[in-house]
Swiss-Prot record:
Biased composition (Polar residues): 1-16
Catalytic residues (UniProt): T49
NCBIfam families recorded: arc_protsome_B
Chief localization: cytoplasm
Protein name (Swiss-Prot/TrEMBL): Proteasome subunit beta
Subunit structure: The 20S proteasome core is composed of 14 alpha and 14 beta subunits that assemble into four stacked heptameric rings, resulting in a barrel-shaped structure. The two inner rings, each composed of seven catalytic beta subunits, are sandwiched by two outer rings, each composed of seven alpha subunits. The catalytic chamber with the active sites is on the inside of the barrel. Has a gated structure, the ends of the cylinder being occluded by the N-termini of the alpha-subunits. Is capped at one or both ends by the proteasome regulatory ATPase, PAN.
Protein task: Component of the proteasome core, a large protease complex with broad specificity involved in protein degradation.
Segments forming a coiled coil: none
Catalysed conversion reaction: Cleavage of peptide bonds with very broad specificity
Length: 243
């Protein structure tokens, strides 16, 4: 597993910052705050979830299930899109509380747009992963554990971002309540240099496997294909359409 911070655009060295624009302007405001108690969190919509990211020969494939639950006991929504585009060639999954994940995605999108406006070029995946880790560690986003996937000049990247802000890059990764079930299939099916089409089938099968036994996952699959040309996201309630 590889940590993205080394030599990233967000490494704080004197040489890097000397000729760069002031990183604190323009300001986007302070982080949102919350005053929820532990009891309140039982009534928060959560995604439960199985989310998967796979690097491929063509780019990256991300897959998620579609279920949201209330307190882990009641299915509150059967059509949740748990992967969102946050970069011209990058996407992030939603894991944890729905509100926290949506706020997290909105904050990252704002920073991505500001970076491009200041520098005239898209932010690299390593820098975006470092920024996402900083947000997860310092912001009030509850227990989120998203996957970031994207393509840049260095190639294809998949990162898992833990609730404490830890960032790890790997060829494939899984997060969420169904991760053990999905990992079992991925360990058998993953091969280097899979095409996007092949990885899509593998990822959908892994989501289906998790949905069979994990009560927090189910109701279909959203598939996200990322290449150097952009991001394509599509949902399927019937697993047979994609496996």
């Amino acid at each position: 597993m590889r940590a993205p911070q080394h030599n990233s655009d967000f490494s704080r060295t004197v040489n890097q910052l000397a000729d760069d624009p002031n990183p604190y302007e323009p300001e986007v405001g302070s982080m949102p705050k919350n005053e929820f108690s532990r009891a309140d969190l039982d009534n928060v919509n959560k995604t439960g979830t199985t989310t998967i990211g796979i690097t491929t020969e063509d780019g990256v494939v991300i897959a998620t299930d579609m279920r949201a639950s209330l307190g882990g006991r009641f299915v509150s929504n059967k059509n949740v899109q748990k992967v969102e585009q946050i970069h011209p060639t990058g996407a992030l999954t939603m894991v944890g509380s729905v509100g926290g994940a949506q706020s997290f995605i909105g904050s990252l999108r704002a920073e991505v747009n500001l970076y491009e406006a200041r520098r005239g070029e898209p932010i690299s995946m390593d820098a975006l992963a470092t920024l996402a880790g900083n947000f997860a560690r310092g912001g009030p986003f509850f227990a989120i554990h998203p996957i970031l996937g994207g393509v840049d000049e260095e190639g294809s990247h998949v990162y898992s971002i833990d609730p404490a802000g830890g960032v790890m890059e790997d060829d494939y990764t899984v997060t969420g309540s169904g991760m053990q079930l999905a990992y079992g299939l991925l360990e058998q099916e993953f091969e280097e240099d899979l095409s996007n089409d092949e990885a899509t089938t593998v990822a959908a099968r892994a989501i289906k496997s998790a949905a069979e036994r994990d009560t927090g996952s189910g109701n279909g699959v959203f598939l996200c294909e990322i290449t150097d040309e952009g991001v394509d996201i599509h949902g399927h309630h019937d697993f047979d359409e994609v496996v």
